[in-house]
């Protein structure tokens, strides 16, 4: 979940003096459309071969936390099968003059490794315990919002997303819930 700070609640005429509207300022920055996935693939499901599982072992990953603050550390675990270097591009989603996102950071040619599929546990829970592929501190100037990590396998150009939230713990007018875990 993320709180969006700096917006106006219904019935408010203007922002408090000198508060600035960091979301509006961020959204006015130039964006780009390269955040979209253009080459995806899914594999048949384990129960029914006619239904895609929603995952592609070519490149897939998850984050150590789904919600972080600026200054926090974030680990991203990635598996590539077959083993392949991969690129990670991190985008903040938003209006950005209609482009939908802004590129915040790129990691080129990260070494890939095939990480084991977890066993099915009690209640059909699968708990990945993969090794981190990259770890970084969230920059202090990254404002609250939904962030996409676009993963691209070098060997096949297949792509997928990891999703995380940068949150701001100040009081806010709007709460947005993002359910990215399955």
Which role does the model predict for each range below?
Residues 12, 33, 115, 129, ...:
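Residue-identity detector for glutamine
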Residues 5, 74, 149, 175-177:
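Functionally constrained cores in energy, signaling, and assembly domains
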Residues 97-99, 176-182:
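Short, solvent-exposed beta-strand-terminating loops
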Residues 1-15:
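N-terminal twin-arginine translocation
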Residues 13-58:
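Proline/serine/threonine-rich low-complexity linkers at boundaries of modular beta-sandwich domains
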Residues 59-164:
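Ligand-binding face of N-terminal immunoglobulin V-set domains in extracellular IgSF glycoproteins
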Residues 156-178:
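Extended, polar beta-sheet/loop recognition surfaces of beta-rich domains
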């Amino acid at each position: 979940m993320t709180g969006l700070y700096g917006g106006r609640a219904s019935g408010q005429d203007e922002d408090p003096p000198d508060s600035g509207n960091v979301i509006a300022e961020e959204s006015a920055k130039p964006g780009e459309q390269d955040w979209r996935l253009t080459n995806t693939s899914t594999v048949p499901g384990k129960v029914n071969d006619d239904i895609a599982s929603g995952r592609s072992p070519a490149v897939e990953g998850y984050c150590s936390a789904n919600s972080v603050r600026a200054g926090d550390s974030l680990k991203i675990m990635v598996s590539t099968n077959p083993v392949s270097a991969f690129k990670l591009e991190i985008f903040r989603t938003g209006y950005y003059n209609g482009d939908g996102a802004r590129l915040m950071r790129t990691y080129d040619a990260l070494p890939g490794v095939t990480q084991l599929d977890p066993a099915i546990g009690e209640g059909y829970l699968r708990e990945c315990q993969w090794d981190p592929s990259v770890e970084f501190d969230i920059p202090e100037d990254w404002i609250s919002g939904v962030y996409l990590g676009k993963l691209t396998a070098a060997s096949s150009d297949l792509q997928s997303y990891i999703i995380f939230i940068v949150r701001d713990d100040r009081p806010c007018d709007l709460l947005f819930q993002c359910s990215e875990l399955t």
